[in-house]
Every structure is written in structure tokens, then in C-alpha cells.
């Protein structure tokens, strides 16, 4: 038969004392999570962050999301849904996402009302993509480009285009313009350039995330415009450089502010940002622009693109806890430092040191329940 084994009874530590020690340990560990003493990687605790907005930087943000998870050891999953700058701004203002991407800086009234700060995270170019197989290389200047999108120039063999492209045999086909159908930071950048170089465009259409383009085909997002240009003969449209390169879409060489024809490259985009003076993260960004920048090597449709986050991350309207707040700021810090090395392979220019310094100051000022996160 089975034998019952009993241990000798000894006087030991009272059970109430043991229970008290266990409770104390639990409290200490919980406090460590709450104060960030344990990193997400060390604890194994999963954190999920969500973003949405500009498609201009989306290839880079998606790359960052993967590399941050794979290289840092932090168990932080970041999803970014695109949707356009306008949609991203709406979602961050409604606190439906943790961060938003936008190529169009907010008006001071909006950033102040919502308590949002700007973090420029990369530099890019908007290029003029075209689908006209008979043209080997296309050169355009700003005024001619504005005339095309205002439909004052409607055929590829127009004298204004011919004058810029000596030696090219231009076809007589009608030009089909492809534009963004959604509220778009890329449209904000492109229309801003046209408004800078054409007083007629500025007076009739102006700069905006949405423009009432005449007789144009609309498509959603940079991916949508890219594919529509590729599949529409005799068309012209505007997309971010990364999309043109990834999809082998030809794009025009543009005449810049100083009269030089310049292709969109990392170097020409960086040149456009040389010497730019930026405000504080919670300052007025509404007038920040590097469009039509001076300099022989500057590409004329270059732009910063921004991440928007709340200066105070705690809110009764969201479920963000302190661990998530720390993860968000750590991710953004990584993006403007280690993350910059991933930009050039995707045709985004790395931030100048002076811009990184502005971002550092901004990130070091962000709080959770009144306490600085970093």
C-alpha cells in the first residue's frame, strides 16, 4: 500500500509574514514597470503603438517599425496605416492613434489647441512622374509645370515644353494629369511649390492638402498615383521619390531657383535644407518650407515630413499607460538617431545634425502625468 510520508513539524516563519513579503515583491515589480525601470525587452511585456497619416514617408516608417522591433530587443510592435496627412491629423486630434505622420505642418492655432508637437523625422522629394514612352528625358521648369496642372498647357508638344527640351521629338498627345484624391501632404508640398513659382496658380488654387484640380484623374495615396501614372498613357503626376524609384517610374528633371536643372537625389534634397532655421517642437511650424530653395544643387520640391505627438501623453480619453509612453518616445528617439541610417536606401535624406538637435530637445520635453518621459 502507498505510504504516507509526513514531514516533521517545525516552527517557521508565520504565514502572514510570508504573504506580506509576496505582496511587497508584487508591488515593487509593478512599480518598476510603471516607472520604466524594466525595459520592454527585459520584461517580455508586449507594447503596441499605432500611427497613421502621410504616405510620403510610409516606406521609411514601416522599415523603422520592423528594424526597431528586430534590433533593439524591445517587445514593441508599431503599426502605421497611412491614409494621407489629412486623415492622420484628424486621427491624432481625435486621439485614435498614438502618433501621426504629416507633410503639412499644423497651423499654430491647431497645434496649440490640441497640445501637439512637430518632430521632423526625414527629408524627401516630390517628383513629377510621367508616362510618355517617346520622351527619353523630360525637363520642366516651375511655371511650365503650373501651366500643365492648370490645363493651360494640354499637349506634350506645346512650345513651352519644347523650348525646355531641345532635341526631343515631342508627341502631340493630350496630357492627362494624375492627382491625389485624398487630403494629402504630398499635395500640400506640390501645390506649395506651384504657388511659389506661379502667381496665377497661387491666386486661383493656392497651397493646400486638397486642391480643386481642373480636369484631372484622382487616386488615393502615393501608391495610387504611382500605379495610375504607370497604367495611364501620356499622363503626368506627382509622387514621393521613393515610390518612383521602387516602381521604376520616370520623373522629370526640374529647373531650380538658381536656374540649374537638377534631378531629385539625396544630395539635392539635403542641399535644399542647408541653413534652414527651425522653431521649437511646440512652436510655429506653419511657415517652415524648403521649397524652391536657393543653391545650384538644390532640388526645388524638397520637404521635411513630420511626426505629430502630444506634448502630454497622458489622457483620460486614451488607454496609453506610462510603459507605452516610454516605448513611444524611445522609438521616436531611435528614429531620429539610429533610424536615419535606413533612409538613404529608400531615397530619404538623413536629417542634418541641427535638426536632430531640435528633435532631441522636443523629445526630452514630452511628459506623462506632468513628468518628463525621458
What does each of the following model-derived ranges do?
Residues 1-46:
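Secretory targeting signatures
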Residues 15-18, 36-374:
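Flexible loop/hinge segments at secondary-structure junctions
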Amino acid at each position: 500500500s502507498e505510504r504516507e510520508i509526513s514531514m516533521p513539524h517545525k516552527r517557521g516563519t508565520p504565514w502572514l509574514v510570508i504573504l506580506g513579503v509576496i505582496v511587497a515583491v508584487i508591488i515593487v515589480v509593478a512599480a518598476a514597470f510603471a516607472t520604466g525601470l524594466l525595459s520592454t525587452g527585459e520584461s517580455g511585456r508586449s507594447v503596441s503603438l499605432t500611427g497613421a497619416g502621410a504616405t510620403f514617408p510610409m516606406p521609411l516608417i514601416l522599415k523603422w517599425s520592423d528594424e526597431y522591433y528586430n534590433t533593439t530587443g524591445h517587445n514593441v510592435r508599431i503599426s502605421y496605416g497611412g491614409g494621407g496627412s489629412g486623415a492622420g491629423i484628424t486621427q491624432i486630434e481625435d486621439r485614435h492613434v498614438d502618433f501621426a505622420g504629416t507633410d503639412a505642418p499644423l497651423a499654430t492655432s491647431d497645434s496649440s489647441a490640441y497640445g501637439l508637437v512637430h518632430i521632423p523625422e526625414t527629408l524627401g522629394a516630390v517628383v513629377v512622374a510621367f508616362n510618355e514612352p517617346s520622351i527619353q528625358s523630360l525637363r520642366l521648369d516651375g511655371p511650365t509645370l503650373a501651366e500643365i496642372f492648370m490645363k493651360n498647357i494640354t499637349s506634350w508638344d506645346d512650345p513651352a515644353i519644347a523650348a525646355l527640351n531641345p532635341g526631343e521629338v515631342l508627341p502631340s498627345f493630350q496630357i492627362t494629369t494624375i492627382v491625389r484624391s485624398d487630403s494629402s501632404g504630398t499635395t500640400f508640398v506640390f501645390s506649395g511649390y506651384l504657388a511659389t513659382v506661379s502667381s496665377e496658380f497661387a491666386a486661383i488654387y493656392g497651397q493646400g492638402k486638397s486642391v480643386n484640380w481642373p480636369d484631372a484623374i484622382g487616386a488615393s495615396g502615393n501608391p495610387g498615383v504611382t500605379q495610375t501614372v504607370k497604367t495611364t498613357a501620356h499622363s503626368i503626376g506627382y509622387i514621393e521619390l521613393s515610390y518612383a524609384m521602387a516602381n521604376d517610374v520616370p520623373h522629370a528633371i526640374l529647373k531650380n531657383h538658381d536656374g540649374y536643372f537638377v534631378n531629385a537625389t539625396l544630395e539635392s534634397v539635403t542641399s535644399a535644407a542647408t541653413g534652414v532655421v527651425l522653431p521649437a517642437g511646440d512652436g510655429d511650424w506653419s511657415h517652415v518650407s524648403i521649397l524652391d530653395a536657393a543653391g545650384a544643387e538644390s532640388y526645388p520640391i524638397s520637404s521635411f515630413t513630420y511626426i505629430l505627438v502630444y506634448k502630454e501623453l497622458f489622457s483620460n480619453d486614451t488607454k496609453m499607460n506610462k510603459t507605452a509612453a516610454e516605448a513611444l518616445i524611445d522609438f521616436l528617439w531611435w528614429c531620429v538617431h539610429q533610424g536615419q541610417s535606413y533612409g538613404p536606401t529608400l531615397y530619404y535624406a538623413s536629417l542634418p545634425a541641427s535638426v536632430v538637435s531640435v528633435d532631441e530637445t522636443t523629445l526630452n520635453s514630452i511628459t506623462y502625468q506632468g513628468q518628463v518621459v525621458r
